[in-house]
Amino acid sequence: MKTKSIEWWNSLKKNDDTDVTAIEGDTVVYISGIAFLIQRKNDFNNVVCWKVKTTKKDLVSIFSTFRAFCQKNDIQYLRIEGHGKHHYKMLNLLYKYSPEGAGLAYAVEESKEYKSNIWYVKTY
């Protein structure tokens, strides 16, 4: 696991769903081919994930490492927003493999453009 600069994140070629600009105060973590941008503005822990390179490492162990990083840095909730299969895969990974006592906090729907589910997942 490595902490990367926001400039590194901003230099990555990403698709439309993950083309988010990192700003001062955000945190970028790189674990086994996957980059995590933790947006910290207004104390929200919105996380954007991007697969930088194909990895043979198990996705569950990558998320376990990421959760350990969250616990060490006192990030208690992650905000997951989106729609479609990738959104639900990430939600299910965080929920299914979360430590005992953690899990789904709550969910709301809001968006004029499309149905967008916003979930807050407790990390520990």
Question: Model regions: which residues?
Answer:
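Short, aromatic/basic amphipathic alpha-helical patches
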Residues: 88-100
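A conserved beta-strand-loop-helix scaffold within acyl/acetyltransferase catalytic domains
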Residues: 17-44
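Conserved catalytic-core motifs of GNAT/GCN5-like acyltransferases
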Residues: 98-118
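Conserved acetyl-CoA binding element of GNAT-fold acetyltransferases
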Residues: 41-54
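Conserved acetyl-CoA-binding loop-helix of GNAT-fold acetyltransferases
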Residues: 55-68
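Conserved beta-strand-loop-alpha-helix junction that forms the acyl-donor binding cleft
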Residues: 79-91
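Short, high-confidence coil segments that cap the C-terminus of an alpha-helix
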Residues: 72-75
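Short amphipathic alpha-helix that is part of the acyltransferase structural core
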Residues: 1-19
